Structure formats: C-alpha cells, structure tokens
Amino acid sequence: MRHLIVCLLVVIVSTSFPAYSASPKKNSDIEKIVKEISAKRIEATIRKLVSFETRNSLSDTISDTKGVGAARRWIKSEMERCNAENGGRMKVEFDEHLAPVGARVAVPTPIVNVVATLPGEQTESRDRIYLVSGHYDSMRSTPIDPDGFAPGANDDASGTAAVIEMACVMSKYKFNATLVFMTVAGEEQGLLGSTFFAKAAKVKGMNIAGMITNDIVGNTKGSDGKVVRDHVRLFAEGIPPLKEMPDEWIALIRTGGENDSPARQLARHIKASAERYVPKMKVDLIYRRDRYLRGGDHFPFLDAGYAAVRMTEPNEDFHHQHQNVRVENGVQFGDLPEFVDFAYTADVARVNAAALASLAIGPAAPREVLMENMRLENNTTFRWTANAEPNVTGYRVVWRETTAPFWQKFEDIGNVTRTTVYGVSKDNVVFGLQAIDKDGNVSVVTYPKPFRP
C-alpha cells in the first residue's frame, strides 16, 4: 500500500503541470506592426521590380530603367525613403562582393546585397541579430541569360517586397535586439550573395541568433489547381550533413535531440509567435532543410553555424517558375505578376514581422544549459548561466514527449540558475529552457547538454 501511495503521488506531480502555450499577453507594438503591413504597397513593389524587365545578376548595371543595377538602386532608395520618414535610425547600405567565373557566372561579376540594419535599443541585446531576407535577382529558363525578359514576380520579388515592407513598417518601432532586412543578389547563380554575407558574418563574429529567408511566397494556386491562402511552409533543418561531426552535434544525437537543432528551436518559436498574432495563417513546420533536394539563401547561414529557416508558399506552380514567358498549348508560362496573390504575400509578411518582433523584443536564449546526470533518478535537474538582460525575471522549463513535435508542458521558475523538475524523468521526455522577461516575453528554447562532473 505504501508503494502504491508513492507511485500515485509521482503521477499526480508529473501530470499537474500546465499545458505549454506562448505568453498569453500580447504585445501592442507587434499587433500594430501586423496591422500596418500593406498588401497594396507590396503589390506596388512587386510590379516595380518586374518593370526592370530582368534582374538577372549578370544583367545591365548602368541603365536606370532595366537590369539588376537599376533594381538594386531602387531597393536601396526605397529603404532610405522609409528610413528618413521613420526617424533615420536604420542604416541602409550596399554589401558588394566580386563573384569569380563559375558555372553560372561567365565573367567576374559584382554581386550586391542591399542591407538595412535597425540597431537594438538594449545594450545587453544589441549584438544579438535577427536577419530576414529575400532575393531580388531573377532568371528565365536558364540562369545565364542576362538580357531576356525575366519578371521574377513570385521568385522572388514576392520575398523581396515582403522584406522591404517589413523594413518600412518595423523601422518605426524600437526593439531590444538588432534587426537586419536584407535583399540579396546571385541566388539564381548559386546562393552567391547570401554566401558572401554569411561567410563574412562568421569571420566578423556576428551574433546572428536567427535568420529567415522568404523565397517564393506569393502564389496560392498550385500546379494542380488547388488554392491554399491560409498556410505557409517553414523548413527547418535537424542534424546537418557534415563530414566531421562536432562535439555539440554528437551530444545532441547521444541524448535523443535529433529534432532539437537550433534551427528547429527557432522554427518552433516562429510558429508559436506568428500564429498568435496572425491567427488566420497556419505555419506548417516541415522538418527538412528545404524542399526535396532544393535549396535557398538560408543554406549558407546554416553552413556557417547559424540557426536559419526558409518560408515558402504551400503549393508551387512550376509553370510560373524559372520559365521563359510564353504561351504553349494554350498554357501561359512565366513568372508574371498576375499569378501573385498580393494579399497572401502580405499575410506572409505579417507572419515574418510578428515572429521577428517577438524575437527582437524578447530575451536571448539561455546559455550553457546543462542537465545534471550524476545519478540515476526520476527527477530532472538543470543548471545554466544567467541571462545578462536586466529585464529577465525568470526562466521556464519546457518538455514534450519524444514523439511530439511541439512543447507540451512547462514549469515557470524564478530568477535562479539551477532547478529540479520533480517526477518527470529525462528518460521519457525532451526538455528545454526559456528565459522570460518582466512583460512575459519568452526566448527561443535552449536544448540542455548532459553534465557529469
């Protein structure tokens, strides 16, 4: 009987924790940002980008009306205009690199990213960066045709327009961490612009805590005729394909954390934040680096060791992707504006903006989170390094069943650096730790490493 009572007590303790959910209190600034995103402005931006006829990275750089040069100068001027209207706190600049001759580059070619940086307001968080991108270059059926009509309305004027709109709206507001709004070139030539930036960021030691790329986010009608207006796909990598496995990844695998990579923790946070503020949109988290054997501008950031994810529409139409503009057998081919759903693109921008704002307002993910493994027991003890931000007031232990994709239970604790969760065994669930600030904003989850002195 005594044994039965003890067992019942453990069950009661382990099942009395509340179900996990994002912070119930919404941030009024994030709500305003979401409302201010404009489908009309996004449409105007996409049509303007298409008006340059081609934005192929090998195209004209001298003309003011045609080619990649005219496009990038217009993007920069548009971001500068918004910056001037919003107080001038954002730094807008070209990030230029020279691409050598390669399979998709006939001659050495300048690849120019347009980068707008909104510095964080909190001293302890200013070096923490969240970056959002879209690629402004376009292509026809071949990436090495610099002169033919390549409108690129969906791929990727849609993502570029979303990034410009976010920069223009969000630069009115203040965030603890730094936000970077970047439109890149050379994506169709092999992720050149993003690769140059990510490698340079790694060398500089930039603390990019999260990166989202938006690529092909404007179409709602797939090749099969199915229309989906309320979903967006979010691709997040697990264990990366590495020739040599660093100790941190080995520890992740040994402890059953294959589904808890930094990219997937970021993606879970994005999904939770976005669906709170844009409830009509469903963020479909897909546990894959990208679409099957395909790629995007988040790859170089992943390869540099940063948490990076990709957003894209749920059901692509390949008649309007990487196609010469033509009518064939009564079918219109080509990436034209009439095949972009501008209202949907605005909703995707809202999803991004809500997630980015939540990340930049909230605290940093806890550091050096360890799960103690000194003895065999059914309780679970953690220790970690305290966050530096003065407004952090506590931490939250979260967990889920090993087969569950999202966090299910949590326990809030005070502003301490060690705690024990009683009656929940590390054998049976996956744990994580979040920081919480005085307003209830939560950080991205940190997966704990095993600790045995």
Task: Name each region found by the language model.
Residues 22-66, 320, 328-329, 335:
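N-terminal capping segment at the start of a domain
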Residues 41-119:
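A non-catalytic alpha/beta surface segment that caps or lines the substrate-entry region
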Residues 50, 217-238, 285-363:
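Active-site-adjacent mobile loop/cap segments within catalytic or ligand-binding domains
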Residues 116, 132-133, 137-191, 352:
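Alpha-helical metal-binding/catalytic segments enriched in His/Glu/Asp
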Residues 184-296, 308:
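Metal-dependent peptidase/peptidase-like ectodomains
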Residues 378-391:
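Conserved aromatic anchor
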Residues 409-416:
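Short beta-strand segments within Ig-like beta-sandwich modules, predominantly Fibronectin type-III
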Residues 421-442:
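Beta-strand-rich modules
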